[in-house]
Amino acid sequence: MQNFGIYIIGDEILSGKRQDGHLSKVIDILSARGLQLSWAQYLGDDPAQITTALKTSFTKSDIVFSFGGIGATPDDYTRLCAAEALNVPIERHAGAVAEIVAQFGESAYPKRVFMADFPQGANLIPNPVNRVAGFSVGLKNQKHRHYFLPGLGIKFAPCGKSAMNTLLG
């Protein structure tokens, strides 16, 4: 049986400044398909902690959804940590840049465009809410099993459901 796990990343969740809505949504989406969540882990905005967790989960065959840490603020480390955990460089994805510029115009520069920097080999996960894509990655020669999505519930809904629906059918 396939295991499913989630990471929910952000100091704002751990401090109580924001409430997590991802756990219950993922459980609902999986349950509707007769599947269940195997594990969940909350992580702060600590690059070493995030990288260590990802290195561990990349070595397993679990399908993992990660929420948070892919924005453009200084505490958004998840993209960099995923690249480090995979031992690949970060590269700017032209398709993601085009979506960000289409949404934000000139205000995409200088900071929002960083949201188009993904681990080498990443696939985009379209986001119809604000056109800032999520991404999926996996170890070399493996199917992509890790899906990185926005951390705010309103942004998760279409982007996350789209990714999960594509994966789960």
Segments and roles (model prediction):
Residues 11-12, 69-72, 151-154:
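Short glycine-rich anion-binding loops that position phosphate/pyrophosphate groups of nucleotides
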